[in-house]
Amino acid sequence: MISLNHYLLLCVILFCIGLFGILRRSNILMLFFSTEILLNAINIGFVAIGSYLNDLNGEIFALFIIAIAASEIAVGLGLVVIWYKKHRTLDITTLQNLKG
């Protein structure tokens, strides 16, 4: 039987992987993927704790996070496509050109 501690350890590992990806990558798509890993780690934690406490609030909150993440990715990928068409790169350092 997998205990709550195993799920929470998985959450911490996934959260660290996502945080490492955000801090170390300079590609905009990799930043989006790392953000999704962070959000999925949090979702696993909410569902695991909700299941452990026999409460549906964890699952409901995880569904809201999934919906918000989907809208974030939809808007973000649209902006990335426009950015790539204009600059022909997905490197985050090119965002410094936006200084007004």
From Swiss-Prot:
Compartments where located: Cell inner membrane
Enzyme Commission number(s): 7.1.1.-
Pfam families, sorted: Oxidored_q2
GO function term, MF aspect, one: quinone binding
Record-annotated membrane-spanning stretches: 2-22, 28-48, 63-83
Membrane topology note: Multi-pass membrane protein
One GO cellular component term: plasma membrane
UniProt xrefs under Gene3D superfamilies: 1.10.287.3510
Principal location class: membrane
Residues in the signal sequence: none
Keyword flag Nucleotide-binding: no
Catalytic reaction equation(s): a quinone + NADH + 5 H(+)(in) = a quinol + NAD(+) + 4 H(+)(out)
A biological-process GO annotation: ATP synthesis coupled electron transport
Keywords noted in UniProt: Cell inner membrane, Cell membrane, Membrane, NAD, Quinone, Translocase, Transmembrane, Transmembrane helix, Transport, Ubiquinone
Broadest EC class assigned to this enzyme: translocase
Oligomeric and partner information: NDH-1 is composed of 14 different subunits. Subunits NuoA, H, J, K, L, M, N constitute the membrane sector of the complex.
Function description: NDH-1 shuttles electrons from NADH, via FMN and iron-sulfur (Fe-S) centers, to quinones in the respiratory chain. The immediate electron acceptor for the enzyme in this species is believed to be ubiquinone. Couples the redox reaction to proton translocation (for every two electrons transferred, four hydrogen ions are translocated across the cytoplasmic membrane), and thus conserves the redox energy in a proton gradient.
Family designation: Belongs to the complex I subunit 4L family.
Name of the protein in question: NADH-quinone oxidoreductase subunit K
Originating organism: Helicobacter hepaticus (strain ATCC 51449 / 3B1)
Upper lineage: Bacteria, Pseudomonadati, Campylobacterota, Epsilonproteobacteria, Campylobacterales
Gene name of this polypeptide: nuoK
